[in-house]
């Protein structure tokens, strides 16, 4: 029921689920950072594993920094549209070389070599795990993520859909700085923020942060 409510909200307001998730994450980060308004999250748009794959079939970037400055007075729905508008502007430049974007971020924020400015990364996979072939339709499927221990990002969240229409949240994180409890807190508050926001989209981000 909860997932259906999120999807219905996106459909009714012409929003993508990615942007709703980004809003949930950035609001949580703002809450735990004394109301910080300037939040940046890396959003994956084309997953490619190796450097060679970065430029195969073109040089479409694998991810982009989703930076938004949202004041506490901004209502939930307007904040979601701010993220969506920013993302639409970025998508026009999705053919940028990934290395160029990383270099630009390094110059802008003076980050040391082999480090990054952003600590949170998001991938949303809208495809459900379901077999369309009638001959195979009775075969049940189950997929599960397993970390290989090489967490190159401080916190990397992959959100996908299950066969029954639910959503699966897979967290990969660097254990030197984070632990499972941190992921539980992120999930708990992100869900409270999102469900409060879709129930009362006219409520301000500041009010939502106080209530949750």
Feature map (PLM): residue ranges:
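Generic solvent-exposed, charged/amphipathic alpha-helical segments
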Residues: 22, 26, 84, 88, ...
